[in-house]
Amino acid sequence: MNQNNLTFQLPGRNESTRFEKIHNITYDNVAEASALIAQEIANGIRNCKSEFYVLGLATGSSPIGVYKELVRLHKEENLTFKNVVTFNLDEYFGLKIEDKNSYHSFMHTHLFDHINLPKDQIYIPDGSLSEKEVSAYCLSYEEKIESFGGIDFQLLGIGRTAHIGFNEPGSHINSITRMIALDPITREDAASDFNGLNFVPTKAITMGIGSILNAKRIVLLGWGHKKAAVLALTIEKEITNTYPATFLQNHPNCTFILDAEASAELSKHKTPWLVKECDWTERLIKKAIVWLSNQAQKPILKLTNRDYNEHGLSSLVASQGLPYELNIWMFNQLQHTITGWPGGKPNTDDKNRPERSDPAKKRVLIFSPHPDDDVISMGGTIARLIEQGHEVHVAYQTSGNITVSDEEALKFIEVAENSFLKDKTTLDHLQSVKQDINLNENNLLKEVLSIKGAVRKSECIAAGRFLKLPTKQLHFLNLPFYETGKIIKNEPSATDYKITQELIDKIQPHQIFAAGDLADPHGTHKTCLNIIFKVLDDLKVKKYMDACRVWLYRSAWQAWDIEDIEMAVPLSPDQVIQKRNAILFHQSQKDKVMFQGKDNREFWVRAEQRNQTTAELYNHLGMAEYAAIEAFKQYLF
């Protein structure tokens, strides 16, 4: 299929889509996919034969790339919006238009303020109405859509409850614009935007399922690992009002545009051998044998020819060899990932080890997007590297200041006040900052953020001291892109790249460790990783980079699949406790976490259970039984 063509195609027409009920296309690059969607919208606007081209618009992080490209098309390619009318899907009830969390604010920030769309052609549900006014208003919203001939192109996102718009589980297929009570999961997902669940509205005004299905063309965006399960259910399972997005199966011109992580749970990607004939790459063979071991509930070396045949893997045996040979090969592949020497074991044959033996003492640079990602993700490995004599450096890429609660900041200010009783200038300054915290709802003032950043920095130093890591080998980069004081960050600038490149140039590491978990709900990990990738691409011409290997870890948000793991560092029970204690030095992140995501467990609990699960998976596959395992994947540049 031409990936540049988003034209609707009936699902199920070929073997690869036979389990699917909604047309979908997967892209490796979100920016590329967003640009193609924006181009389809632009073509619709330019080719519109009626007076107006009517757009249905969504909010949230998913469509931001599309809006960014539409702005570019307007400014650089003269795309005009004078013949466009827009209708937004929804709005929180009880928010004023000017509220920073309103969808009015969102749309003006990301699109409307940057294009020539007349203000009287913009329609967004009004969340500031009284409850008595809502019913009549919703009917008028529907009538207004109909008066323009209906929606030509509807852009959608999808929530964890499979809601589209704010159509929560239980919504009727024929529902129209109305007020709805928000599902607890939906409110939980919005909690970080509102600085706490208590401040999230309980109701919203939303276009109905029927309103959405009346659109002539629908495109739904799905980005990221956290959307994979609900997207697979929506695309492959039966229609049910328990999962409202499944109603889109009834639409004659609906396409889902996904990235690789969001489409990972679709049968054609998760178990392609059950869908069609496979091109058996090494990674796919690993994936299939791990899956078979789980299905058959047997360790790898006990899998039989019958197991392969009964679970749809006869083609693997036919093309790759006898089960006995496959089992031995896979067992060795896994065994060779395990090492207690993450920096390489000196004076040994390293042919079957994940890391080189030379040089025996390496310079190691660990990049940590937030100030605690290093110990959460690889605290046990850091301890091993230090104990085995390597020169370990940790670079904290961002200050993490917005993740410190006001209460935590006040506590440190009060400690400081009690330490400077005779210094009136300092006391006056601290009193002023305390007043700022008490009076300002969002606390984005530079002085407040500076103190919160200092809290995070002191915690890093304490954790490093516990691991016997010299403070001089801790590098606080404070990358400027992060310093907005808000969840939404700036795009990386030349300064961000320069700071990162200068540090790598200075240390000239033999190993770099970086966060490869792109499921971080606020995108900081992805931005930090992209900065590193860009810098590595620029630096690879330098001689010292020939001796540098890059390893990606995953932290509190996501784990590596077994078939992707290339280095597995086992932890003993004592090392698990050592790692836990290192994490607990980050006290500001222990109890009241500002941006916890959708997992309510504390970070140290998540990390511990994730490492234990990886060890259990290895053991189930026939490897030795360990208390925990930290896993890494090599990045080739």
Report the location of each language-model feature.
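ATP/nucleoside-binding phosphotransfer catalytic cores, i.e., glycine-rich phosphate-binding loops
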Residues: 2, 210, 216-311
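Short Gly/Thr/Asp-enriched flexible loops that form oxyanion-binding sites at enzyme active sites
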Residues: 66-72, 163-176, 522-538
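Active-site beta-strand->loop->alpha-helix modules in alpha/beta enzyme cores, enriched
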Residues: 294-371, 375-546, 580-585, 599-604, ...
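Class I SAM-dependent methyltransferase SAM-binding "motif I" and its flanking Rossmann-like core
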Residues: 161, 165-209
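Ligand-binding beta-strand-loop-alpha-helix segment within the catalytic cores
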Residues: 7-21, 79-153, 279
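N-terminal glycine-/serine-/threonine-rich phosphate-binding loop
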Residues: 1-54, 350-351, 358
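Glycine-rich N-terminal segment of FAD-binding domains in flavoprotein oxidoreductases
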Residues: 47-78
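A conserved mid-domain beta-alpha-beta active-site/ligand-binding segment of alpha/beta enzyme cores
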Residues: 558-614
